[in-house]
Amino acid sequence: MLGKFVVGVALLASTVALAGPKEDMIAADRAFAKMSLEKGAHAAFLAYMTDDVRLFEGDHPPIIGKKAAEAYYAKNPDPKGSTLDWTPVEAMASDAGDFGYTRGTWVFAAKDEKGKDINVTGYYVTGWKRQADRTYKFNLDIGGADKPAR
């Protein structure tokens, strides 16, 4: 019985040892994507970005800072009924775990003025910075479509 207990504790310890900054960044990215589906992309971006964020996406100049993102989103709201979802496929982290990135694929879905489906897919890289409370927020997001909207 003691042998099974020791093996069980060893397995648990090895599982816990596998969790680390990369896994935490993947988890943050997944929670960020979930919020995008539940509350809208802009709300999720504002909730997960740092004050000094850099956003490089779309056909506009880079957006520098959270206040600039808030202003941009106020003038350019999420299209009604649209969704933005993404899936992280890889994470890298510094040895200290204070910063790193995730990368993956994204899917944007909406309808045009005539009700026709618009679907755009692409790739992204998001830079993450560990906060004082040990959670991660992103300070860099770069996204690009891999083909024209259809």
Model segments located where?
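Bacterial N-terminal signal peptides that target proteins for export
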Residues: 1-7
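Long compositionally biased, domain-poor regions of proteins
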Residues: 27, 34, 47, 73, ...
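Generic short beta-strand segments
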Residues: 52, 103-110, 144
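A solvent-exposed, acidic/Ser-Thr-rich amphipathic alpha-helical stretch
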Residues: 22-26, 40-92, 103, 116-119
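Short beta-strand edge/turn micro-motifs at domain boundaries
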Residues: 121-146
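Short, structured motif recognition centered on aromatic/hydrophobic residues
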Residues: 32, 86, 99-103, 127-128, ...
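Short, low-complexity N-terminal intrinsically disordered segments enriched in polar/charged residues
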Residues: 2, 12-51, 149-150
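A short, structured loop/turn motif at beta-sheet edges
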Residues: 91-100, 113, 129-135
